[in-house]
């Protein structure tokens, strides 16, 4: 079995978007959890274009004497996964842990992820126990997880939980990928030799509301589908062929019924023809929408614009020099 050197430094990456209410508690609990590790650590918080006071609070936390906080400030909102990738580009640890800022995944679980990674795993995922989300979110999450498992063939139980640990070589491999639409847990698993999941607690959200609106969830679903595989395009071709065969068979049926019963049956077939027409139009719009998603993402990749723009990085002088040496 492939072995890795002991983890000397842990980097915790946390995307932040309008989380000023939860930041003091997040910083306190995360720092306390990391202090129990008995090894070096840093806490990178990426401000994803917040409109509240989050950026100022992160800057002050990073500038405080003896702070382990690194503040990465983006110029605007790019989305959770792009913000995490921005954090990945500035980590100095050899084990990287991602964590949400809403405290629904307790920072106190960090030592358990580090201990599991020490057993020789490239990726340590988590499965939320007693999940404190709405029925809609739970149902959507189960459907997406099943879709991912069927498509990738990897039986990971909870791809939606961002409390995860990654070895440094996994992070470097992901940073070498240049697609604009990225879903980090899936991308990481494509590079992992050994991956495992552990159960973790899931708490109710104490501060603010979820930053994932219905439209953001829809966009995330499209990211999942299009970044995984081109299978939907093949299914679209199969679906179109089935519709064409059904249309041909139904056309023959209409001819037979007309010959048997005359033009008077079913209002001379007007309603049935409308039903068939709407079925075909609906199928065409589904196909066009799916093709449009793929073409739009190809267009974004061809433009080769950066997936994020870092406006400022605030860190302690000694850690800044180490980060420059690594670069």
Swiss-Prot record:
A Pfam family it matches: Glycos_transf_2
Lineage: Bacteria, Pseudomonadati, Pseudomonadota, Gammaproteobacteria, Enterobacterales
One term under GO cellular component: plasma membrane
Similarity annotation: Belongs to the glycosyltransferase 2 family.
UniProt-listed InterPro entries: ArnC_tfrase (IPR022857), Glyco_trans_2-like (IPR001173), Glycosyltransferase_2 (IPR050256), Nucleotide-diphossugar_trans (IPR029044)
Protein name: Undecaprenyl-phosphate 4-deoxy-4-formamido-L-arabinose transferase
Its membrane topology: Multi-pass membrane protein
Gene3D superfamilies cross-referenced by the UniProt entry: Spore Coat Polysaccharide Biosynthesis Protein SpsA, Chain A
Transmembrane segments: 236-256, 270-290
């Amino acid at each position: 079995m492939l072995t890795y050197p002991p983890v000397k430094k842990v980097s915790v990456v946390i995307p932040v978007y309008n989380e000023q209410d939860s930041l003091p508690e997040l910083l306190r609990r995360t720092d306390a959890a990391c202090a129990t590790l008995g090894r070096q650590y840093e806490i990178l918080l990426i401000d994803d274009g917040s409109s509240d006071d989050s950026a100022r609070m992160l800057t002050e936390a990073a500038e405080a004497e003896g702070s382990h906080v690194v503040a990465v400030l983006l110029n605007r909102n790019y989305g959770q996964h792009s913000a995490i990738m921005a954090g990945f580009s500035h980590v100095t640890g050899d084990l990287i842990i991602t964590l949400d800022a809403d405290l629904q995944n307790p920072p106190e679980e960090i030592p358990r992820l580090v201990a599991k990674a020490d057993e020789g795993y490239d990726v340590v995922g988590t499965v939320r126990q007693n999940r404190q989300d709405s029925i809609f979110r739970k149902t959507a999450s189960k459907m997406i997880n099943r879709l991912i498992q069927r498509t990738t063939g990897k039986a990971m139980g909870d791809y939606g939980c961002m409390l995860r640990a990654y070895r440094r070589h996994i992070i470097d491999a992901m940073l070498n990928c240049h697609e604009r639409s990225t879903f980090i847990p899936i991308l990481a698993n494509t590079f992992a030799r050994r991956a495992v999941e552990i159960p973790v607690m899931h708490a109710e959200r104490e501060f603010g509301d979820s930053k994932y609106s219905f439209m953001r969830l829809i966009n995330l679903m499209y990211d999942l589908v299009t970044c995984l595989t081109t299978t939907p395009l093949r299914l679209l071709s199969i679906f179109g062929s089935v519709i064409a065969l059904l249309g041909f068979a139904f056309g023959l049926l209409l001819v037979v019924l007309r010959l048997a019963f005359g033009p008077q049956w079913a209002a001379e077939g007007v309603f049935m023809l409308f039903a068939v027409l709407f079925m075909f139009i609906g199928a065409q719009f589904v196909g066009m929408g799916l093709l449009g998603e793929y073409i739009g993402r190809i267009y974004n990749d061809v433009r080769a614009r950066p997936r994020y723009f870092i406006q400022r990085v605030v860190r302690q002088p000694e850690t800044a020099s180490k980060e420059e040496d690594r670069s």
